[in-house]
């Protein structure tokens, strides 16, 4: 079933039984008319979003680098044209339909109604899909990453992202994508260890950067990413949901238009927020390792598809 686009958003055009309808998938559990849901919806409509959020132009590379280093994230608008937005939305919708039909109760793999694009693939990546391959050649992305990393020798880690269905009524706890290595237990992804005990991962330059692309408008109600500015270098304990102050829950990257790019230092604290709309919110991404940082990668693209890529894209995915 193909995607139905409306007002810059992706609407799920299938029911749990796979029958085409005007009703979107989602809203398992609490009803959208539940008093608590309606109260939260009113609260978010009034208060949600980072105050003074800057959406930069694609030519403001210097400012983008400056804001990224200060805040741990930056948003650049008009990175994708309308055709690219449609291609990306269609590609996301293919995965969303496949995953949603396998999970009729919307349990998710990142919490209720929440899913990882990478987590739905054996390779932890969607690099085999043309929609994600297209993103490798976005000009402004390479300009900004080269400036941040100080080199063109960065590589692709994965082509992933996440989506949340309407009816994701709960907040996801704040977290960081990377941690220091620790003895005992399971070593986290992209961990770092200083045997002298002097330097933390948070004292280093960004080890890897996540590039999120928006195939739909991100609004106050459809599950915007909450991002806590300046936390990429913080050694403080990340608060749980009970400890988290209200201002952090409202510190979301919205409103942001379809076609925008959000670059994130993955060390910064971030988390999912409620999607109280009637449309799925998708944020596909590309993840890049700094030239000095490496860890084992799972191949995510066939050699046949690799040969079809541009020279620039081939350089990025040479270990993917």
Residue ranges and their predicted role:
Residues 170-255, 295-301:
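Catalytic core of non-heme Fe(II) oxygenases with the double-stranded beta-helix
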Residues 9, 13-53, 102, 233-245, ...:
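Non-heme Fe(II)/2-oxoglutarate
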Residues 159-161, 211-213, 284-288:
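A structural signal for short, well-ordered beta-strand segments
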Residues 9, 13-71, 77-193:
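Non-heme Fe(II)-dependent double-stranded beta-helix
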């Amino acid at each position: 079933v193909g995607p139905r686009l409306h007002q810059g958003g992706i609407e799920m055009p299938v029911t749990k039984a796979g029958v085409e309808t005007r009703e979107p998938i989602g809203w398992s559990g609490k009803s959208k008319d539940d008093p608590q849901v309606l109260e939260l919806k009113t609260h978010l409509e009034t208060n949600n979003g980072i105050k003074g959020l800057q959406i930069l132009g694609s030519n403001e590379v210097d400012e983008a680098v400056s804001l990224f280093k200060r805040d741990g994230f930056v948003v650049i608008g008009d990175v994708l044209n309308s055709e690219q937005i449609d291609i990306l939305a269609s590609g996301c919708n293919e995965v969303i339909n496949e995953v949603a039909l396998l999970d009729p109760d919307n349990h998710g793999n990142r919490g209720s109604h929440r899913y990882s694009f990478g987590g739905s693939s054996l390779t932890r990546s969607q690099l085999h899909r043309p929609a994600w391959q297209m993103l490798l050649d976005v000009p402004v992305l390479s300009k900004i990453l080269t400036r941040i990393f100080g080199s063109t020798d960065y590589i692709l880690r994965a082509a992933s992202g996440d989506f949340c269905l309407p009816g994701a009524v709960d907040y996801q706890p704040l977290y960081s994508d990377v941690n220091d290595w620790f003895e005992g237990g399971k070593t986290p992804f992209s961990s770092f260890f200083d045997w002298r005990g002097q330097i933390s991962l948070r004292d280093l330059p960004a080890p890897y950067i996540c590039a999120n692309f928006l195939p739909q408008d991100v609004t106050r109600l459809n599950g915007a990413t909450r991002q806590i500015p300046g936390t990429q270098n913080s050694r403080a304990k990340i608060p749980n949901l009970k400890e988290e102050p209200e201002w952090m829950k409202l510190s979301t990257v919205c409103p942001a238009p379809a076609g925008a790019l959000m670059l994130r230092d993955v060390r910064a604290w971030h988390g999912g927020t409620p999607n109280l709309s009637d449309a799925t919110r998708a944020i596909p991404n590309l993840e890049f390792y700094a030239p000095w940082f490496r860890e084992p990668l799972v191949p995510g693209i066939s050699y046949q598809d690799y040969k079809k890529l541009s020279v620039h894209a081939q350089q990025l995915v040479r270990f993917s």
